[in-house]
Structure formats: C-alpha cells, structure tokens
C-alpha cells in the first residue's frame, strides 16, 4: 500500500494547485460516475447531467459530520486527490474526478419573474411526481429571512440532529446566507443558489429539507421607487430591500433596454447638421445686418466702434511684438534643430566661407555707393543670418565626399579691413595691379582633399553631388576648381601643366576657338585651277583630347578618330572637286555676260566655236533637267513656315541659278527673247578683280528658281 501510495505521488508530480485556494464543504465534491451509482435502471431524464452533479447525500452527511467532529480529512488534500486526472482509480482520463470549488459565473440568469418559483410551491404528493423538476430552480434568501425562520427550521427538522447542527452552523455565516448551502450546492455572486440532488438521495431526507424551504415571500403591495443597487459586498446586508424591488426593476429594465436612436441618426443625409450650420450662418448674418443698421441710424455708436477697432489693433500690435520678442529669444539647440538650424554652424561660418558670396556684391556697390562701409556691413549681416536649406547626409555619404570645399589661403587671411581698403581704393582712383590681384585672390577658391575644417558641416550639408570622390556644389557660391599644389607653382609652369593635364570637368572654350580659327581661316576664293590644288580650307576640326584613366576607352576613341579622319578626307576630296567645277562654270558664264550677248557668228566674238558649242550644250542640258524637276516640284508642299516664306521671296527673283540664262532657237533668228529678268550678283571672289566685282545676268522670269548648287559664300 505504501509503495502504491508513493508511486501515485511520483506519478502526480505536476500537481494541480488550482483548488488549494478554496475551502469549505464543496472542496471534496466530485462528479459521480455510473459505477458509483445504484444498479437500478434509470430513464434518460434521470441520467441527465443536471441531476447527476452532486454526490449522494448520505456521503455528504458523513463527510460533514466528520468535519465537525474534527476527524475529517483535510479538505485541500482531499480535493487534490479527487481532482487529479492521473489517479489510479480513474481509468478514463477525460472523465475522472473533478474539483468543483466554485461553479458560479456571470452567465446565470438574473432575477426575473420565473426565478421566484420556490421549492415550497410543491406538496409532498407532487414532489414524488416531479422529483427533479425543482433541482435547478434558484431561490434568493436573505439573512433576515433565515434569522426569522430559524425556529421553524429547528422544529421541522428535529428528526435528524446532525442535519440540524449543520444547517444552523451554515446559516450562522454572515455573507453566504442560503439554506441550499447546507446541501452543498454552489453559491453564485448574487446569492442565487442551485440545489442539485442526485437520483440516489433518499426521498425522506429530501422531503425534510424541502419542508424547511416553505417560506413566505414578502408581498409586493406597491411599486417601489427606483433605488441605487449597491456593490456585491454590501448586497447581502441590503438583500431584503433589493428582493422586494427587484421584480419592478426587471420590468422597468426590460422596457428601458430597447434600442434608442438619436434624432441625428433618424435624420437622413446629415440634414440635421446642415440645418444647424445654416441656422448659425443666418444668425451671424442677421447680427451683422443689425449692427450695420444701428451704425447708420445712430452716430454715437460709430465712435464706439472706431474706438473698439483701434483697441483691437493695438492689442494685435502688442501680440505681434510679443511674438517677435519670443522669436528673438535664445532657444535651445534641440528647438533650433527642428527649425533647420544646425548647432554651432552659423558661428563657425567665418569670412572664409562667406567671401565668395560677399565679394561680387562689392563690385556692384562700388560705382554708385555713397556709404559703402554701411552697405557692406549690412550685406555681411544678411549673409550671416541667411538661412540655408540643410541637406541631411548619412555618415557614409560624408565619408564618400573625399574632397571638401575650403577657400583660398589668401582669401582666408583677408578680413573686413582688406575688403574696406579695396573699396576705399576704388573711390580714390583707378585700381592698382596689386589691389586687383588681391581682389581676384579673395574671389578664388580651391578644393583641398581630405582636409579638416571648422565649417565642414556647413559645406557638406550644402546641396551638392559627388562624382569620382569629388564634391560638385549645386549652390550659387562660385568656387574655382583648382588643385591645392597649383598655387605654389609659377604662371609658366601652370600653363605647361594645363596643356598637359586638361581637367575632365572644365571645357576651356578659348583653346577650342584658337584651334578652330587657326585651321578654318578660309582664304578669299581664287580661280578654279588654284582651288582644285588647294586643300587647306577644307581641313576637318580636330577633337580635343580627353585624359581618361581607362585604357580601353582611349583605344576605342583612337579607332573612332582614325575612321572619322578617313571619312572626312574622302568627303573633302569629292566636295572640292565638285564645287570647284561648278564655280569654274559660273565664272566662265559671268565673264561671257560681261563681254556681251552670245552670238553664233565667230567673227563677233574673240572666243572660238568650241567654247560656244560647249556653252550651248550645257544650257540645253540644264533646260532638260529643269523641266524634269518642274514636274516633281508641282506636287511638293512646304511644311515649315520659314522655308515657305523664303521660297516665296526667291520664287520671284532668284530661283534656279543652275540655269543662268536660257537659249531659244527661233525660226527667224537665234537670239534671246525680250522677256528677260536682269539681276546683279555680288560675289566675294569678284572683289579682287575690281571692275568685274558685279555682273548682270539676264534670265527668263518663268524659269528662275532656287537651286542647291550655289557656290559657297555667294550672296544673291
């Protein structure tokens, strides 16, 4: 037995300690199983769970008697043994012994009209028929009722002394004063007790208990007034008053507990809100109209209103002054930080960082300045207190910015005195070269790589971009991009280095212009034989060599450059040949026009027949080309307005200079027709010939059209 007991303790190592906090007669309550009940057959109604909650009454009486005699088992240990699911006496783990210390919850039904059906309503005969119908009916018994009926309980239950002793002892308790606790039912929060009996309980004991319950309910003669219900602790002391008024309260509660809806919910579409706002608007407008009428009718109120408005203005001025004084107060650093002010930055911004901003202003002020020093100080003050947009950077981006902007060393030493001296010197007379050099140095800046500075944060937080570890600013401050070692070098060495090392970010237009002007000095047009041989005017533009670190980029650029050079040479040869031939032809035609009309007779001109035949063949060829082009040009439409305006001007005057004149073979005589248009053509190549600078060409007006074969630099 001892081994078995020890084994059971070992098996029950994770003890359930929930029921240790509960004491009383219900601590050893357990759900009865079908094995512990009698062997007689029962119907389904008697086997219902509502009627099988309590153990047999004889067992309960024995346990209560033992408890009063002092030989009872400790209720805590008993409840632990009975409530343990791992006990050997329980083969089924899901439906074993159960600790039913406190079954009360808030889901029990409230005091209603059905909750007052007492056990005393049934007689002994009716009780046998409905033995279990009353077991779940709640009854509320106050302390006054129990004290009032103590004598009746003792007289009716005088048969069994043990029951009387237990009942009186239970009824003597202060808070849980209900008769049903004597039979080990479960008290709820509101002292409504459920007396649950088993089918195995004897009829005699149940009858004796039920006889004790025949109590007279207090009669309700009037509807009581609504009184405030106290807390649960004070509920038992005022249970009589609550018991008398609970029925009427429940009736009123059922009436009042219906769903209420406010007027705003009933009003669809927010009309209530609309009408209230409209009423407020009308009220304001009406008040304004009333005040306006009063001001017009009564003059004395006008003065009052003026006085009032003046007082309001003075108050507003006072408030504005107060707000400005509050703004000018020294605020803490965390408040400044919220306003975009970074601590200890504006103080560290000296003239070194402000000179690029200040110096251009001095040059503007100098000519017309009557009091330059005062203006300079104001501009400095404005620059000092100028708010700059703070650009927040992460530590990684600050580390990435390897180059930091600082000002020039000469400009670092320049103070307000130097700037004032420059201004005074400009007033007194012309600028000396030393002052000019000093002023230029103040404007210049530089990049110093990885150099610490007091105003580092101000410069880093300026809007800028980082390209190849170089900070390129996006602000209006003009910093000249120079390396830090360049100041020490002489001017000649700087020129040599600039020629060798051209910065990627600086494109110097002066060098490009010099190269282009050297290679594109187009000389005056010469005769066609010289133009054929001379190729100097059609050289291509050399590209500026860029210093790149990557070798593959250099190789690809060299290949592209060679290809472009070859292509340009081929185009140059072709264009020089074609253009030279056409210029030669125009020159010859111009010379023929200057000498006079072309005639077929060889004796009238000093030119040979060979020349005349070639000219006539050229003219006829141009005629046939023009006729072909006329067919296509009829269907063309000019889209752009500029070309259409140009064409409209040239259509009447200079349309096709490829056909300088038209030759007509008539039957009567081989001469030109009288319908002609004469134009004076000013050519650049004719300037060297003096008298041949201008020439008059006669064309047919209908055949004059614009041509793309005009020679270069010919002005029509």
UniProtKB/Swiss-Prot annotation:
GO CC entries: cellular bud neck septin collar; cellular bud neck split septin rings; nuclear inner membrane; plasma membrane
Biased composition (Basic and acidic residues): 1-16
BP terms from Gene Ontology: maintenance of protein location; positive regulation of mitotic actomyosin contractile ring contraction; protein localization to cell division site after cytokinesis; regulation of protein localization to cell division site; secondary cell septum biogenesis
Location of the protein in the cell: Bud neck
Principal subcellular localisation of the protein: other
UniProt feature, compositional bias: Polar residues: 370-382
Region Disordered: start-end pairs: 1-30, 370-394
Regions crossing the membrane: none
Superkingdom of origin organism: Eukaryota
Family: Belongs to the AIM44 family.
Protein name in UniProt: Altered inheritance of mitochondria protein 44
Originating organism: Vanderwaltozyma polyspora (strain ATCC 22028 / DSM 70294 / BCRC 21397 / CBS 2163 / NBRC 10782 / NRRL Y-8283 / UCD 57-17)
Name of the encoding gene: AIM44
């Amino acid at each position: 037995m001892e081994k078995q007991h020890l084994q059971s303790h070992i098996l029950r190592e994770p003890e359930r300690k929930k029921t240790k906090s509960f004491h009383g007669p219900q601590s050893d309550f357990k759900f009865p199983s079908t094995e512990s009940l009698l062997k007689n057959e029962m119907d389904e109604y008697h086997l219902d769970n509502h009627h099988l909650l309590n153990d047999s009454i004889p067992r309960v009486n024995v346990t209560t008697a033992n408890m009063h005699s002092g030989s009872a088992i400790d209720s805590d240990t008993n409840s632990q043994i009975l409530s343990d699911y791992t006990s050997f006496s329980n083969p089924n783990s899901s439906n074993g012994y159960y600790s039913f210390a406190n079954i009360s919850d808030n889901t029990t039904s409230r005091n209603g009209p059905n909750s007052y059906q007492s056990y005393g309503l049934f007689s002994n005969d009716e009780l046998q028929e409905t033995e279990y119908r009353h077991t779940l009916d709640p009854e509320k018994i106050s302390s006054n009722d129990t004290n009032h009926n103590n004598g009746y309980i003792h007289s009716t239950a005088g048969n069994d002394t043990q029951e009387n002793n237990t009942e009186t002892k239970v009824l003597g308790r202060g808070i849980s004063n209900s008769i049903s606790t004597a039979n080990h039912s479960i008290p709820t929060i509101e002292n409504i007790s459920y007396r649950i009996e088993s089918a195995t309980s004897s009829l005699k004991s149940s009858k004796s208990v039920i006889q004790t319950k025949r109590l007279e309910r207090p009669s309700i003669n009037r509807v009581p007034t609504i009184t405030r219900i106290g807390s649960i602790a004070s509920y038992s002391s005022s249970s009589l008053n609550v018991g008398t008024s609970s029925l009427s309260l429940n009736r009123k509660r059922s009436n009042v507990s219906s769903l209420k809806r406010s007027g705003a919910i009933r009003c669809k579409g927010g009309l209530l809100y609309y009408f209230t706002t409209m009423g407020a608007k009308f009220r304001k407008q009406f008040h304004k109209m009333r005040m306006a009428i009063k001001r017009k009718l009564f003059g004395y109120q006008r003065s009052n209103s003026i006085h009032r408005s003046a007082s309001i203005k003075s108050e507003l001025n006072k408030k504005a002054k107060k707000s400005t004084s509050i703004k000018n107060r020294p605020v803490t650093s965390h408040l400044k930080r919220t306003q975009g002010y970074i601590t200890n930055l504006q103080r560290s911004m000296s003239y070194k960082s402000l000179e690029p901003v200040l110096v251009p202003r001095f040059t503007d002020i100098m000519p017309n300045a009557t009091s330059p020093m005062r203006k300079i100080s104001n501009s400095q003050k404005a620059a000092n207190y100028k708010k700059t947009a703070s650009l927040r950077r992460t530590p990684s981006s600050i580390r990435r910015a390897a180059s930091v902007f600082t000002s020039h060393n000469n400009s670092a030493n320049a103070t307000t005195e130097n700037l004032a001296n420059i201004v005074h010197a400009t007033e007194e007379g012309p600028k000396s070269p030393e002052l000019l050099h000093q002023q230029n140095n103040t404007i210049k800046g530089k990049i110093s790589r990885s150099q610490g500075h007091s105003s580092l944060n101000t410069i880093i937080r300026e809007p800028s971009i980082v390209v190849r570890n170089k900070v390129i600013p996006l602000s209006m401050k003009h910093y000249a991009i120079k390396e830090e070692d360049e100041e020490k070098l002489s001017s000649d060495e700087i020129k040599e280095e600039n020629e060798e090392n051209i910065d990627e970010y600086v494109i110097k237009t002066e060098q490009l212009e010099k190269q282009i002007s050297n290679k594109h000095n187009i000389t005056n047009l010469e005769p066609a034989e010289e133009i054929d041989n001379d190729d100097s005017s059609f050289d291509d533009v050399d590209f500026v060599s860029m210093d790149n670190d990557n070798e593959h980029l250099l190789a690809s650029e060299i290949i592209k450059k060679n290809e472009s050079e070859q292509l340009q040479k081929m185009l140059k040869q072709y264009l020089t040949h074609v253009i030279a031939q056409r210029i030669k032809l125009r020159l010859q035609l111009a010379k023929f026009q200057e000498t006079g009309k072309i005639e077929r007779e060889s004796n009238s001109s000093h030119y040979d027949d060979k020349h005349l035949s070639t000219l006539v063949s050229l003219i006829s060829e141009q005629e046939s080309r023009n006729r072909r082009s006329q067919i296509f040009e009829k269907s063309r439409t000019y889209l752009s307005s500029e070309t259409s305006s140009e064409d409209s001007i040239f259509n009447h005057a200079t349309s096709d200079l490829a056909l300088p004149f038209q030759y007509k073979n008539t039957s009567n005589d081989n001469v030109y027709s009288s319908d002609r248009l004469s134009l004076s053509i000013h050519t650049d190549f004719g300037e060297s010939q003096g008298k041949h600078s201008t020439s008059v060409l006669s064309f047919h007006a209908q055949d004059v059209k614009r041509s793309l074969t005009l020679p270069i630099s010919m002005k029509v």
